[in-house]
């Protein structure tokens, strides 16, 4: 049976770093309050001339190098983003051009913070169907450009960055993506959204969020989704080496671990260094886990994310 094997992982964070203390110069907050409430210590912010496609391309190049494959071996590029360079064309086609992947077709998907898990599921199905062999899956966001920097309830939470994974068809029965599950509930679309849109008012707008309710949904739905994928594969918490949750808030990660009785040392946490990077969150956390020596070959990991829509999903993978 064909499996989608992770060949390489790459990441990119802009050079500019904004600490919590720097935010206190423009809004009423404190480093202590932000760290206690979110676990965030700093965030990376893109330069004015830096585009989402630039960051995505940088992360992709590192992933390709890590995988040890040539750019022309890529059959498909999927970019998960809420902040593309332009309304159209897709960010993925711009990345394809910048990379020079002449043999690939490319498109974007938008599921906000769940975007990377959605993209992994789509890529996995393309590979399993035999339509493609090797896929570049990228999550990239410039969230700083859709923030109200005077709204302390949202501007302290987000950062910019990109992460990428190279997936390739494999017949190794014990490695690769084992299964995914995806969910949506549009009745909650007004809990997390932007104040603008192409058809709505012709401007990008800024992030608006009912933080308390989103927080509650995140704990409930991430927990249920993790239990669902474990049940589907006849696995228990003890069978999983690592849990890589969307890096939105340290308290969400802690409370999901507590609710499911997951030993906290199994939780991958990188939010302190880059804040909530939306669709880039999962691959950035994976890159951190790999580069820090935690994530090793043959480890079993659960990737889980939730975002606006609401959308949420989980991916079970053996590295």
Curated annotation (Swiss-Prot):
EC nos: 2.3.1.180
Keywords attached to this entry: Acyltransferase, Cytoplasm, Fatty acid biosynthesis, Fatty acid metabolism, Lipid biosynthesis, Lipid metabolism, Multifunctional enzyme, Transferase
Location of the active site: 113, 246, 276
Pfam families for the chain: ACP_syn_III (PF08545), ACP_syn_III_C (PF08541)
Enzyme class, UniProt record, top EC level: transferase
Pathway stated in the Swiss-Prot or TrEMBL entry: Lipid metabolism; fatty acid biosynthesis
Record protein name field: Beta-ketoacyl-[acyl-carrier-protein] synthase III
């Amino acid at each position: 049976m064909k499996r989608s094997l992770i060949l390489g992982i790459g990441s990119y964070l802009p050079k500019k770093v904004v600490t919590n203390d720097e935010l206190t110069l423009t809004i009423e907050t404190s480093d202590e309050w932000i760290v206690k409430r979110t676990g965030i210590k700093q965030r990376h912010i893109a330069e004015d001339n830096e585009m989402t496609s630039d960051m995505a391309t940088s992360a992709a190049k590192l992933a390709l190098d890590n995988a040890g494959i040539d750019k022309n071996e890529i059959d498909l590029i999927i970019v998960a983003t809420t902040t593309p360079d332009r309304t159209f064309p897709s960010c993925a086609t711009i990345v394809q051009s910048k990379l020079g992947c002449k043999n690939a077709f490319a498109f974007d998907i938008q599921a906000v913070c769940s975007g990377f898990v959605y993209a992994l599921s789509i890529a996995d199905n393309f590979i399993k169907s035999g339509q493609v062999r090797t896929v570049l899956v990228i999550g990239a966001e410039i969230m700083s450009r859709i923030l109200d920097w005077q709204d302390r309830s949202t501007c302290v939470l987000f950062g910019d960055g990109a992460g990428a994974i190279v997936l390739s068809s494999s017949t190794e029965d014990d490695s690769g993506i084992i299964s995914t599950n995806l969910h949506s509930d549009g009745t909650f679309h007004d809990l997390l959204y932007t104040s603008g849109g192409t058809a709505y008012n012709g401007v990008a707008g800024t992030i608006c969020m009912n933080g308390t309710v989103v927080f509650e949904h995140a704990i409930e739905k991430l927990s249920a989704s993790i239990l669902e994928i474990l049940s589907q594969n006849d696995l228990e918490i003890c069978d999983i080496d690592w849990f890589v949750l969307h890096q939105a808030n340290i308290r969400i990660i802690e409370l999901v671990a507590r609710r499911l009785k997951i030993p906290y040392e199994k939780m991958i946490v990188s939010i302190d260094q880059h804040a909530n990077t939306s669709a880039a969150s999962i691959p950035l956390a994976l890159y951190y886990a790999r580069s820090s020596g935690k994530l090793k070959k043959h480890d079993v990991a659960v990737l889980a994310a939730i975002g606006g829509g609401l959308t949420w999903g989980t991916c079970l993978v053996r590295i």
